């Protein structure tokens, strides 16, 4: 089993990944990311273009894009008064989340299998009633 240091490191990584976890934890933001990927415009997409592809209002799309940007998933560039959103090319925050999740899988996979205890707990509970 992994030691306390590894578990503490995992806890620190999850805290560091809080923004991206919150960003991808919303169904609307996941939908926006998928739509942007399907649009495939490397130079970026405007809020209005994305709004046309979703059921969300323009202010809602803008709000969700800002959260994705703050989480490091998207970047934005300005051309005059126009804002173009595009995927961050280094994807550092997404890679960090993947590493944290892999660390969690590694730790959890070393824990003892407790599935057989479920039946034992039910039998014990029935016996004391």
Which functions belong to the PLM regions below?
Residues 2-17, 34-38, 86-129:
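Amphipathic alpha-helical dimerization/coiled-coil segments
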Residues 47-76:
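Canonical helix-turn-helix DNA-binding module
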Residues 28, 43-44, 72, 112-115:
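Secondary-structure transition/capping residues
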Residues 15-57, 81-92:
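N-terminal helix-turn-helix DNA-binding core of bacterial DNA-binding proteins
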Residues 7-23, 61-69:
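Generic detector of contiguous secondary-structure segments
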């Amino acid at each position: 089993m992994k030691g306390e240091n590894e578990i503490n490191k995992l806890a620190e990584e999850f805290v560091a990944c809080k923004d991206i976890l919150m960003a991808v934890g919303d169904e609307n933001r996941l939908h926006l990311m998928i739509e942007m990927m399907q649009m495939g415009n490397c130079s970026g997409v405007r809020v209005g273009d994305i709004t046309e592809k979703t059921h969300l209002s323009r202010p809602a799309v803008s709000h969700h894009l800002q959260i994705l940007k703050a989480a490091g998933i998207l970047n934005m560039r300005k051309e005059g008064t126009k804002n173009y959103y595009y995927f961050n090319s280094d994807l550092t925050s997404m890679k960090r989340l993947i590493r944290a999740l892999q660390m969690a899988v590694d730790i959890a996979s070393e824990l003892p299998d407790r599935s057989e205890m479920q039946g034992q707990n039910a039998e014990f509970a029935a016996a004391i009633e």
